[in-house]
Amino acid sequence: MTQQSPYSAAVAEQRHQEWLRFVALLQQAYAEDLHLPLLQLMLTPDEREALGTRVRIIEELLRGEMSQRELKNELGAGIATITRGSNSLKSAPVELRQWLEQTLLASDK
């Protein structure tokens, strides 16, 4: 196992700060009802479609009615994308998972 160089750590920190800056910008855009135009500016149509697909993946994984292979066929997503979603969901904080269940599966009740 190799250690990251200080440069790599610095780059990682810079990227993290850029991500936090984007999140803050998005929060402000929501507060000012500019979130849709901001997201359309920042994301390509393909990226917006990919985010929609990821929401569906999480929703279906939470629902638990389809296998990952069935999800792949249903959504046209790669099995690696579905597996990453599954692994991320498993490591998500309990509060987030509960919120996602309440929010995404509300129509099931």
UniProtKB/Swiss-Prot annotation:
Give GO MF terms, alphabetically: DNA-binding transcription factor activity; sequence-specific DNA binding
Q: Which InterPro entries match?
A: Trp_repress (IPR000831), Trp_repress_bac (IPR013335), Trp_repressor/repl_initiator (IPR010921), TrpR-like_sf (IPR038116)
**Cellular component terms (Gene Ontology):** cytoplasm
Keywords for the protein's UniProt record, in alphabetical order: Cytoplasm, DNA-binding, Repressor, Transcription, Transcription regulation
User: What is the superkingdom listed in this entry's lineage?
Assistant: Bacteria
Transmembrane domains' residue ranges = none
Specify the DNA-binding region ranges: 68-91
Q: Does the keyword Protein biosynthesis apply?
A: no
Report the Pfam families cross-referenced here. Trp_repressor (PF01371)
Query: Main site of residence?
Result: cytoplasm
One of the GO biological process terms = negative regulation of DNA-templated transcription
Supply the HAMAP family for this chain: Trp_repressor
Query: What role does it play?
Result: This protein is an aporepressor. When complexed with L-tryptophan it binds the operator region of the trp operon (5'-ACTAGT-'3') and prevents the initiation of transcription. The complex also regulates trp repressor biosynthesis by binding to its regulatory region.
What does the subunit section of this Swiss-Prot or TrEMBL entry state? Answer: Homodimer.
Q: Which family does it belong to?
A: Belongs to the TrpR family.
User: Which protein is depicted?
Assistant: Trp operon repressor
User: Which organism does this record belong to?
Assistant: Klebsiella pneumoniae subsp. pneumoniae (strain ATCC 700721 / MGH 78578)
Which gene is this protein's source? trpR
